[in-house]
Regions:
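Glycine-rich loop(s) and the adjacent beta-strand/alpha-helix scaffold that form part
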Residues: 59-62, 67-158, 168
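Conserved redox-cofactor binding core of oxidoreductases
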Residues: 1-66, 70-72, 135-158
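General small-molecule cofactor/ligand-binding pocket signal
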Residues: 8, 49-51, 116-120, 194
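Residues that flank catalytic or metal-binding motifs in active/ligand-binding sites
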Residues: 52-55, 65, 113, 124, ...
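FAD cofactor-binding and catalytic pocket of flavoenzymes
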Residues: 137-234
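Active-site rim elements
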Residues: 25-28, 97, 121, 162-167, ...
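Short, flexible loop/turn elements at secondary-structure junctions
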Residues: 54, 58-63, 73-75, 132, ...
């Protein structure tokens, strides 16, 4: 606050600017995933079928309409017909890949791979953004989480977690973050700072090494990258 960065009590209210405690999706001290929170309570519904261990090949397009999907399970193709609609929600990488394998995307690129064009949609796979990050680890003169990571203390933390769902192992690694502006006149933050109360370095093989002396790690992330990439089919 002394340097003009406010405390942000709720960074999900439309304004991220400031320093804030990180929210965690937890229940009873354990991580609560989307599957835990939303699928588990309704798994027995008669109108819901959950298929695991499967990967979608493509959407079935008939007369400019999505009528189903073809997916692979145990390497065998399975065709599934849709009664109403097909919703593509496979993430940044796989959503455009599925669309392009289905003939929806940049026509010239689809023809390169011998895919019949259903819809020439040049924007599919474009505008990929990567949030570059650098980190700095420092030893400090105040107690941090590092002092709690010795082998004997970790046994106690593990028991506290298993028996009471409390303690160190229930906390997210990054507990405090800040959304900052590199220039005061910017309308929105363009830098994100993450703070970890333990130093994490990497050895020559790229393995993470956790410092057990009092230390901190700071991650600096580009929030609004200007460079753009793309997702393309390899085959």
């Amino acid at each position: 606050e002394e340097i003009g960065v406010p405390i942000n009590q709720d960074y999900c209210d439309g304004s991220q600017f400031g320093v804030y405690r990180v929210y965690a999706t937890q229940k009873d001290g354990r991580r609560c995933s989307v599957a835990n929170a939303y699928l588990d309570p309704v798994r027995t519904r008669a109108n819901l079928t959950i298929v695991t261990g499967a990967q979608v090949d493509n959407i079935i397009i008939e007369n400019a309409r999505a009528t189903g999907v073809i997916y692979r399970q145990n390497s065998a193709p399975v065709q599934l017909e849709a009664t109403r609609e097909v919703i593509v929600s496979a993430g940044t990488i796989h959503s455009p890949a599925i669309l392009m394998r289905s003939g929806i995307g940049p026509a010239a690129h689809l023809r390169e791979h011998g895919i019949d064009v259903s819809v020439d949609l040049p924007g599919v796979g474009q505008n990929l953004r990567e949030h570059n990050t650098i980190s700095v680890a420092k030893l400090v003169s105040i107690p941090t989480m590092s002092a709690q990571l010795g082998p004997f203390r970790m046994v106690g933390h593990l028991l506290n977690y298993l028996l009471r769902s409390k303690g160190l192992l229930t906390t997210p690694a990054v507990q405090v973050m800040a959304a900052l502006k590199s220039e005061a006149d910017l309308s929105d933050p363009d830098l994100i700072l993450s703070m970890l109360p333990v130093a994490v370095n990497f050895d020559a093989k790229g393995n993470a090494v956790v410092e057990q002396r009092a230390s901190f790690s700071f991650g600096f992330h580009v929030a609004r990258p200007q460079s753009r990439g793309e997702i393309r089919l390899r085959s």
